[in-house]
Amino acid sequence: MKIWTSEHVFDHPWETVTTAAMQKYPNPMNPSVVGVDVLDRHIDPSGKLHSHRLLSTEWGLPSIVKSIIGAARTKTYVQEHSVVDPVEKTMELKSTNISFTNMVSVDERLIYKPHPQDPEKTILTQEAIITVKGVSLGSYLEGLMASTISSNANKGREAMEWVIHKLNAEIEELTASARGSIRTPMAAAAFVEK
């Protein structure tokens, strides 16, 4: 078993970061995620948003890894459960693979919270537990997978910034459009009065 942990601070408020987290895929930084399906989404009586999603991924595994695990197929599926608490301002996301579970399990947990000293920033705490089962060189593969998770976490942070930039651009565009539509009737009314 290998445990990987990381902490990152986003220079954006919690509301922005959690909105981006829900819209993170697809993105050009991590093309291995090829599909996201929402299986269930509901708000519980206390106001928490619960989501259950299925992520489809396509991994380009090195040939040595394919030969060790005895699989040519690289499409895998991950189930993801998240809970967003808008009152406490926390988002907890847990994911686990549902493919190749007889050989490997990757259990990941992410927590997004406002930064305690600066509410305009958000802290992401991330942990992954990797267990390779019944395969020779198991600890080597766990280390390799931890390295891949670390690399993908960096890509994930870049993707979050990309989504946040995209969301901000959409907001600016909508704001400009709304301003234009307000000015047009006012200008027309001013023209009619003359």
UniProtKB/Swiss-Prot annotation:
GO terms for cellular component: mitochondrial intermembrane space. Keywords: Phosphoprotein. InterPro entries: PRELI/MSF1_dom, Slowmo/Ups. The modification Phosphoserine is found at S46, S51. GO terms for biological process: phospholipid transport. Residues 1-172 form the PRELI/MSF1 domain. It holds the Pfam family PRELI. One of its GO terms (molecular function) is phosphatidic acid transfer activity. The keyword Lyase does not apply. Belongs to the slowmo family. This is PRELI domain containing protein 3B. It comes from Bos taurus.
